[in-house]
């Protein structure tokens, strides 16, 4: 299992998560991997300088997200833009909480409570051609106009208040 981390104070993390800490995510995933006899690989955000406590069985990745994604059974992240690299592979992508990348047959929005069931069923509902179509949309439309257009004003105000509380 591959866990791609996001900066905790990044707007994507704040907007799309339940403001859980990366250390909490790691601890949770380490427990799930132990219970299911799985190997955990984590990749911190390149700008994250915080020290994380990991078990000896957890690997820290330094190479490309896309390369690692090709070698694992599942990828999990909190709306990291690195998800775009995963979408270029055939590996199932699971997005914790809300995400701009969560679309039917592209990548699945989940909560932490869903992970054990995902591993036990091992039946991802994702489709490569739909991923390709979604990537084309992202590259040709979404990125041209900006992410903010996809939110209503109430949501933008709420999230900007959360950001200001941190600052």
Regions of interest found by a model, annotated:
Residues 105-167:
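Leloir-type glycosyltransferase catalytic cores
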Residues 26-61:
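Catalytic donor nucleotide-activated moiety binding site of glycosyltransferases and closely related
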Residues 17-24, 63-64:
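Alpha-helix N-cap and loop-to-helix initiation/capping positions
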């Amino acid at each position: 299992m591959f866990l791609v981390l996001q900066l905790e104070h990044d707007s994507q993390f704040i907007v799309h998560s339940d403001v859980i800490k990366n250390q909490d995510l790691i601890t949770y995933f380490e427990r799930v991997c132990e219970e299911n006899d799985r190997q955990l690989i984590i990749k911190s955000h390149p700008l994250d300088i915080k020290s994380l406590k990991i078990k000896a069985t957890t690997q820290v990745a330094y190479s490309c997200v896309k390369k690692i994604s090709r070698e694992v059974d599942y990828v999990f992240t909190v709306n990291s833009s690195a998800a775009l690299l995963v979408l270029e592979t055939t590996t199932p992508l699971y997005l914790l909480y809300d995400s701009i990348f969560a679309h039917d047959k592209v990548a699945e929005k989940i909560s932490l409570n869903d992970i054990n069931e995902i591993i036990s069923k091992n039946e991802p509902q994702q489709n490569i051609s739909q991923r390709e179509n979604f990537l084309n949309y992202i590259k040709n439309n979404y990125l041209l106009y900006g992410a903010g257009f996809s939110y209503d004003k109430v949501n933008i105000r709420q999230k900007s208040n959360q950001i200001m509380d941190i600052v």
